[in-house]
Every structure is written in structure tokens, then in C-alpha cells.
């Protein structure tokens, strides 16, 4: 039979002060740092290979590499004994021969077969921007979209104020910080509304093979800064080069949304069924800002999305709407954390998943923290799961931590197979059982897919999900 685990916690806890962060501009090499106190030889070897694979970089990117090296060297490889990875097995990455991708390789096969898009777009292959398409009227004046190295001096100084100023993530976040070969920047000036969404398409140009266990890893990194009153839509699309490509994509997206600004973030993950995809999304929201994420993920032997959103001002809105679908022997994992620190903040989260394979697993760990001064907060979280095969597994852990006392907060979880009365309703109208099941499964995910703001992305996601049924 299918397996489901729900671990729910609603807690009222005392206020905790955060530990101050310290930064050093001094270059610290991996080998010297490791001699002091390091206990995981595998991570040390990986860190050294990342360092050796990169060429010298600009000062802001070098700061990211230095701080990431420090955190990486104090972090062992995660195991199932670690609570954040309790249900997520990363051992197939650990026991592969990991090879950082060190050079940009223009892949004509990928570029020649790109579908048309009406958006300003960039193709990112192995972390390098390989094809940037922006027409003269695609972006308003003052908007920048491209490599950090191409920023004008005034924007370089402005963007550098925020780079590296995010709370640390886990080991995979640090690996990206050390291994990112470039930084793609999206900058929107104050009061500017970008009508056309900016489309980032990620590919892995190099693939290994499962027999030799050679696993190329790429570390794409994107930074978004939206000034006061600005608005932009961002589409991230991760595409597998072939159905059985063996590689590891380890991306990071950092988003700063200043006062009264809006960001609509669409994320479509269709990696190879043999690949690893571990992504971090960090978001900082100032007062009266809005951040909306819509996600559909179906790819990867292991696919994990870590989302961390920090509300840093009052009257702030956060909305996360996500859909994961397992149709192979795979694990799809969403770890989210929303921190509300100011009055009248609002957050809405809906996560849906389908497990349609007997060796498939879905994981949801959703954390919402309402701190002391976040009075009159309105926070809601709901997760719904469909288990369609015997031994299919879902592990769900909603976690709502409330310190404020004047709030409206709720969370819920539902796990089931298709309802017999719904199937009967279709059959009573002459629709066969298989068609009825497909219709119900498709409609389950449509609630999320229809939230994509762009019709092109909605159609693409809808057709992709239908092809997997």
C-alpha cells in the first residue's frame, strides 16, 4: 500500500535573538582553512576541485566564494540522520565522481533547437550565459539583464551593496557560492514596470554516465534587485538535455524586493530523470512589497527546492504555489521557510504533489515563523497529495511557529488516492475509467498551472504534465 507521513507542529516559542554575522575580506584558501578544523575529507576534496576549476573573478563574486568556502569547510555532507535531510537521500551524489564544469562550451545542438519565445531571454549552459536575446524595445530604460561583469560602474556599486548579504543556506548553497563561474544580474530601477517577463533557460551541456559514475556539476547563480516601486516577472526553466542525462545542476537565485516593488517568479523544472537538481531561492522583501512564486517540478532522480523568504517590512505579501509530480523512481522535495518580522504581513502557501510510481517519493517541509513584532499577521498553508500507486510515498511536515499574539494563522494537510465517487460520476456519464482518472489527475495540478502569469508558460507546463500521465 502507499505510505504517507505527516509531521505537524504548531508552537508558541520565546523570542530568539539572531547571532550577528561577521565577514572577512581576506582571501582564505581551501587547503589552509582545512588544516584548522575539518572532519569531512569528501567535502574538502570537493571544495578543492571547485577552487581549482575557477578563474579569478571580480571582487563581489570573490567575496561570495570566500564566505562560501568558510561555511562549506565547516559543514559535513548531509545524511538521513540530519533533520533537513531525514527523508531525502543524497548518497547517489556523494558516491559519484563529481567533476565541476570549468569551461564554457557553446552547444550548437541546444541553441539550434530552442523554441521561439516572446520574452527577453538568456540561455545559461553549465552556469555560463551562452545566448542573450534582447531586442531594442524589449526592456525599459534603466533595466539591466546580463552578466555582472557587464554592469555599468554605478550599477556595480549599487548591486554590490546586496551581494553576499543573505543568510547562509546549507552545504549545497555553499557549493554554489564556491563554484559559480559567473553571476547573472537582473536590475529594475525605481518605479519601472517591465511588461515582458525575463526568461532564463538552463541547460547542462556536459553529461556523465552512470556506469563510470562521472557526474558533472554546474552552479548557475542569478541575482535580482528590484528598486522601490519596480515590477518584473521572471521565468526560470530547467531542461534536461536528454531523458537519461547524468548530471547535477546546483543553482541559486537571490531576490531583493525593495519597498512597494513586485516580483512574479515562474519556475518550471524538467530535468533528466537520472539527474540531480538541488536549488536554493532566497528572497528579501521590504515594506509593502509582493513576491509570488508559481512552480511545477517533475524532473530529476533527486529534485529539491529550498525556498527562504524573509519579510523585512510591514504590509508585505508572500505567495508560494507549487506542484510536484513523481512519475519515475525519484524524490521531489520542497523545503520552504517564510519568516514574518513586521506588522500586517501576509503569506499564502499551497503545495500539491502527485506520486504515480511505486518507487516515487514526495517530501514537503514547510516552515512559517511569525516573530514577536509581526502582529496582525495573516498566514495560511495547505498541502494536498495524491498517491496513485502501491508503495508510493509522501512525507509531509508542516511547521507553524508563532511568537506574536494577534495573528490569524492556519495550516492543513490532506493525502489520498482518487475519490471513488468522483470516478463514479464520470463513469455514470459514459466516460471510461482510464479517461476519468486522467481527467481528475490533470485537474489536480491545473490549480497550480493556471497561476502562471504567462500563457506560453501555462501551455508548456500543461502539455508537459499531460505527456507524463
Residues covered by each model-derived region:
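N-terminal chloroplast transit peptides
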Residues: 1-25
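Conserved beta-strand/loop scaffold segments within soluble protein domains that form the structured core
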Residues: 2-10, 151-424, 428-431, 445, ...
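Compositionally biased, low-structure terminal segments
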Residues: 24, 86-88, 445
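Short alpha-helical "patches" and their helix-cap loops
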Residues: 22, 105-110, 203, 461
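N-terminal amphipathic, basic helical "cap/leader" segment at the start of enzyme domains
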Residues: 2-5, 30-169, 173-174
Amino acid at each position: 500500500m502507499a505510505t504517507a507521513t505527516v509531521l505537524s507542529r504548531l508552537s508558541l516559542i520565546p523570542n530568539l535573538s539572531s547571532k550577528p554575522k561577521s565577514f572577512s575580506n581576506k582571501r582564505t584558501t581551501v587547503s589552509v582553512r582545512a588544516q584548522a578544523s575539518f572532519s569531512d575529507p569528501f567535502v574538502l576534496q570537493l571544495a578543492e576541485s571547485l577552487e581549482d576549476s575557477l578563474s579569478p573573478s571580480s571582487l563581489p563574486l570573490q567575496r561570495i566564494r570566500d564566505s562560501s568556502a568558510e561555511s562549506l569547510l565547516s559543514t559535513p555532507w548531509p545524511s538521513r540522520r540530519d533533520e533537513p535531510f531525514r527523508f531525502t537521500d543524497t548518497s547517489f551524489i556523494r558516491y559519484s565522481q563529481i567533476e565541476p564544469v570549468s569551461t564554457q562550451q557553446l552547444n550548437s545542438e541546444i541553441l539550434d533547437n530552442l523554441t521561439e519565445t516572446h520574452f527577453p531571454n538568456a540561455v545559461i549552459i553549465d552556469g555560463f550565459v551562452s545566448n542573450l536575446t534582447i531586442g531594442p524595445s524589449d526592456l525599459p530604460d534603466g533595466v539591466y539583464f546580463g552578466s555582472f561583469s557587464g554592469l555599468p560602474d554605478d550599477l556595480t556599486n549599487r548591486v554590490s551593496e546586496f551581494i553576499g548579504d543573505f543568510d547562509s543556506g546549507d552545504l549545497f548553497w555553499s557549493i554554489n557560492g564556491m563554484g559559480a563561474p559567473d553571476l547573472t544580474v537582473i536590475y529594475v530601477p525605481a518605479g519601472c514596470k517591465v511588461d515582458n517577463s525575463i526568461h532564463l533557460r538552463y541547460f547542462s551541456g556536459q553529461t556523465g554516465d552512470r556506469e563510470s559514475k562521472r557526474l558533472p556539476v554546474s552552479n548557475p547563480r542569478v541575482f535580482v534587485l528590484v528598486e522601490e516601486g519596480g515590477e518584473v516577472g521572471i521565468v526560470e526553466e530547467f531542461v534536461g538535455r536528454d531523458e537519461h542525462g547524468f548530471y547535477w545542476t546546483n543553482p541559486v537565485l537571490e531576490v531583493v524586493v525593495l519597498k512597494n516593488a513586485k516580483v512574479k517568479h515562474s519556475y518550471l523544472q524538467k530535468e533528466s530523470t537520472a539527474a540531480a537538481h538541488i536549488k536554493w531561492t532566497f528572497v528579501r522583501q521590504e515594506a509593502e512589497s509582493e513576491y509570488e512564486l508559481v512552480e511545477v517540478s517533475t524532473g530529476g532522480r533527486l529534485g529539491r527546492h529550498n525556498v527562504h523568504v524573509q519579510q523585512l517590512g510591514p504590509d508585505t505579501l508572500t505567495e508560494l504555489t507549487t506542484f510536484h509530480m513523481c512519475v519515475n523512481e525519484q524524490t521531489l522535495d520542497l523545503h520552504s521557510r517564510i519568516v514574518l518580522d513586521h506588522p500586517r504581513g501576509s503569506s499564502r502557501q499551497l503545495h500539491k504533489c502527485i506520486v504515480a510510481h511505486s518507487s516515487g517519493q514526495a517530501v514537503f517541509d514547510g516552515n512559517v515563523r511569525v516573530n514577536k513584532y509581526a502582529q496582525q499577521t495573516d498566514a495560511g498553508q495547505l498541502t494536498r497529495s495524491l498517491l496513485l500507486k502501491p508503495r508510493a510515498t509522501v512525507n509531509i511536515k508542516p511547521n507553524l511557529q508563532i511568537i506574536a499574539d494577534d495573528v490569524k494563522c492556519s495550516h492543513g494537510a490532506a493525502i489520498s488516492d482518487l475519490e471513488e465517487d468522483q470516478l463514479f460520476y464520470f463513469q455514470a456519464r459514459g466516460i471510461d475509467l482510464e479517461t476519468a482518472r486522467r481527467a481528475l489527475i490533470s485537474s489536480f495540478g491545473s490549480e497550480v498551472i493556471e497561476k502562471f502569469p504567462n500563457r506560453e508558460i501555462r501551455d508548456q507546463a500543461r502539455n508537459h504534465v499531460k505527456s507524463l500521465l
